[in-house]
Amino acid sequence: MNPNGKALLKENKRYYLLDSLRGISTVSMVAFHLCYDIFMMYGLDTSWYFYPMTAVWERSICVVFILLSGMCLNFSENGIKRGVLLNLAGFAVTCVTVIAEPNQAVWFGVLNLIGCSMMIVSVLSDNLKKISPLSGALISLLLYAVSYDLQKGCVGFFGLDIVKLPDFLYSCKYLAFLGFPSSDFVSADYFPIIPWIFLFTAGFYLWNFIAQKNLAKYFESKIPLFDKIGKYSLWIYLAHQPVIMGVLMLIM
């Protein structure tokens, strides 16, 4: 996500539909975490998290946010600066969770992933743009699919393990941010650079493809209310869990 809701301006136009899509995903995220807290933390249905549709719901939120973040990087005047700010926000989340709930601490969560992706792609953008948008998007999606199971120690495709990676890659806890978590690594929200940066670059190329095909005009429309929510998605992300937990403590 471009979580701060900025940088959607291009040639004095704002692509409100991107705000709106991010707003819809933000509402979905809040609803998901509300359900998680009710069913899992308060024990109403501790099997809820393991239902197939729950996994689909959770993953859909992540995918949309990361794709949109890659798309919106095309409008950022200083992607490196924004990336640093998001990493600082991610670090703040880590500090708070380590203090408040050590067993549920967040190490390299989605804010850190998006922040690092912004910085990396900003540095490489001139070279990345030498690849055609369609080819870049397809290559990115292929790399995302192939490296999706990297955390499990292999490279594969749609669950098929093709190459098993050497164990030493997973013996150093400091490589977890890259996608090589050690056996004792635990994080309540974990989005390593690999494979997720490839989804980010897919979004980056997707917007270039949209612009190339003169389709950007269709993104000038808005979905009322959701476009407003989308502009404040970072603040909602940072505040929603404490608010949800506070409300549930009062009523349950």
Feature locations, PLM:
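Alpha-helical transmembrane segments and their immediate juxtamembrane cytosolic regions
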Residues: M1-M252
